[in-house]
Amino acid sequence: MVVNPKVVDISKIKDYEDLADPSLKGKVCLRNRKSPYNQSLVANQIVNKGESKTKAWLSKMISNVSQPFFPGDISIIRAVAKKKCGVGIVNHYYVARMLAGVNGRRDALYAKKTKVLTPNPAHVNISAGGVAEYATNKNEAVKLLEFFASPEGSKGLAAPTFEHPLKEVNQNEIVKNFGEFTPDSVTVEDLGEKNSLAIKLMKDAGWN
């Protein structure tokens, strides 16, 4: 999550459930329902909390949304920096890229006005690879995947995108400064099984 300490009391935001607190009325920014990241987050909540509690959480959180839903993470970070909202759900690496100046000086200044908060445990999105059943170069494909799973390959894959490396290797300093966290133990299979229900609950709650 990304927050503006001048708009919200960050000591009161520890978890995703806290975004449903009435004190955040008009201060929450979210991407639209089509975002697979948010669909997975809701599926994660269903697995951990159950359908009933997730439905109640969604209803209260959506009532706190400050304005129409955003098309992407960067626009949310900008809105938080401009105090149009106080907290938003985003992927950390968008903030990291902005801080690094990848998007230009203006976005770097916006990002510096915000702070990244990571719940413990945190919902984690992953990058994955596989080998097609009828691939003609299976041996080479397997070697490539094995390289990406190595410390060197993991670091090389994560560095330009500011993601967390798969292996225990040195992280980008910007990402490292966001702090340590515990990944949620929910599996990809679990998220896939609950995805359709997650979308339904999001729609029912008014998450457009």
Q: Residue ranges of each PLM-predicted region?
A:
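Loop/turn elements at helix/coil->beta-strand transitions in domains of secreted/extracellular proteins
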Residues: L24-V28, K83-G86, A111-K113, K138-A141
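A ligand-binding cleft/hinge motif common to bilobed small-molecule-binding domains
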Residues: G86-Y110
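An extracytoplasmic/periplasmic, membrane-proximal ligand-sensing/linker region
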Residues: S52, E163-N208
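A bilobed periplasmic-binding-protein/Venus flytrap-type ligand-binding module shared by bacterial periplasmic
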Residues: M1-V7, A43, N125-K138, G156-L157
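Extracytoplasmic ligand-binding site segments that recognize negatively charged/polar headgroups
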Residues: M1-K84, M98
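Short, solvent-exposed loop/beta-turn-alpha elements that line the ligand-binding surface or hinge
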Residues: G50-S63, R106-L109, E180-F181, D190
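Periplasmic-binding protein-like
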Residues: G26-K34, L58-S63, Q67-F70, A108-E133, F147-Q171
